[in-house]
Amino acid sequence: MLEAGIRGEQSVAVTSENTAKTMGSGTLDVFATPALVALAEKTCWMSVAAALDEGCGTVGTRLELEHSAPTPVGMTVTCESELTAVEGRKLVFKVSLHDEKGPVGGGVHELSLIHI
């Protein structure tokens, strides 16, 4: 059963494959914003995946995310999520992201439950 308070955590190493330069979102060898978005989304859906009924999944419907600091190759970015509200099919998460030096981003992500 999905209830507010469910938490998740995922980490990813910053490598040449997920930099702004490689992903086409900039010219620098730092963790790309698209990679930050993907990490936030993955952390949220994975935190609730085990509680979903068979044939049920989630899709992202809203994302408000700040990418506030660069993370260079060789460091790790960690995302922590908390399910803050369940409103019918809508799941609302608070996300915070950090690396070894401190905060690098945060915001709100919403998922919608769907039946496949």
Show the residue positions of the predicted features.
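Short, residue-level hotspots on alpha-helical faces of the histone-fold
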Residues: 38-42, 46
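Hydrophobic beta-sheet segments that form the core/acyl-binding groove
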Residues: 65-100
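Catalytic strand-loop segment that frames the active site of acyl-thioester-processing enzymes
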Residues: 1-32
